[in-house]
């Protein structure tokens, strides 16, 4: 539904469009059979912003996020994580606490992941920002009915985010599609597009962001 709203809003003259580069990397390792730790870094680098008067390509560092999670696996299909994020961006660096539940569904040739997350962002001189998020992600092998080392896969996800700060609320939607390279159980690489729309509830400020995204995911 949110994607449909986005397609309608895209017709407005006041829409803002941003394009850029979005690299990310993560490192995961086990503390025990049930507990694990994940460290992640991701960074957004803007190359085009329709709000610029000259409408030319111009590089701008948007933000960099440093994240750490500790998770407990309750079964092969259910995991709970708590995490912390430090965001570096122009104006003010922020702190964020994160809580999430991940549920995995496996079938003969595909897998579907559900993630329910809430997070709280703390600012120096602004009220707390609270967000509730749900992400649905599917993954299918592109070479045969199972994913084996050295093969490729397709990953598609959509995430809906509700946020509220003081008395003001908003919605954001994130749709991503990527081509994955499964080297082995400990190494994966993905390249794709991440399309985000937000400011649904802000009059005349609807925003599109399209990121060219690459990611490397390492497990020890």
What are the roles of these predicted feature ranges?
Residues 29, 72, 103-105, 140-142, ...:
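Residue-level signature of outer-membrane beta-barrel architecture
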Residues 37-39, 78-82, 110-116, 132, ...:
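Transmembrane beta-strands of outer-membrane beta-barrel proteins
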Residues 17-21, 62-64, 93-97, 126-134, ...:
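Residues that define the transmembrane beta-barrel architecture of outer-membrane proteins
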Residues 101, 208-220:
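Outer-membrane beta-barrel "beta-signal"
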Residues 33-34, 77, 91, 106-111, ...:
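Short loop/turn motifs that connect adjacent beta-strands in outer-membrane beta-barrel proteins
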Residues 13-74:
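Start-of-domain marker
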Residues 41-47, 84-90, 105-109, 118-122, ...:
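Transmembrane beta-strands of outer-membrane beta-barrel pores
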Residues 1-15, 220:
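Bacterial Sec-dependent N-terminal signal peptides
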């Amino acid at each position: 539904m949110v994607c449909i709203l986005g397609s309608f809003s895209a017709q407005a003259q006041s829409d803002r469009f941003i394009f850029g580069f979005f690299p990310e990397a993560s490192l995961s390792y086990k503390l025990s059979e049930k507990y694990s730790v994940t460290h992640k870094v991701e960074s957004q680098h803007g190359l085009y912003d329709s709000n610029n008067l000259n409408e030319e390509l111009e590089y701008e560092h948007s933000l960099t996020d440093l994240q750490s999670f500790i998770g407990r696996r309750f079964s092969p299909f259910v995991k709970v994580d708590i995490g912390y994020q430090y965001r570096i961006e122009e104006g003010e660096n922020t702190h964020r606490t994160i809580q999430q539940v991940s549920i995995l569904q496996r079938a003969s040739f595909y897998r579907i992941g559900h993630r329910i997350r809430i997070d709280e962002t703390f600012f120096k001189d602004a009220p707390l920002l609270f967000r509730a998020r749900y992400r649905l992600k599917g993954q299918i092998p592109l070479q045969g009915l199972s994913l084996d080392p050295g093969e490729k896969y397709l990953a598609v996800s959509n995430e809906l985010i509700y946020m509220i700060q003081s008395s003001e609320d908003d919605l954001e939607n994130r749709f991503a599609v990527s081509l994955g390279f499964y080297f082995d159980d400990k190494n994966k690489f993905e390249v794709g597009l991440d399309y985000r729309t937000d400011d649904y509830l802000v009059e005349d400020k609807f925003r599109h962001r399209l990121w060219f995204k690459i990611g490397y995911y390492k497990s020890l």
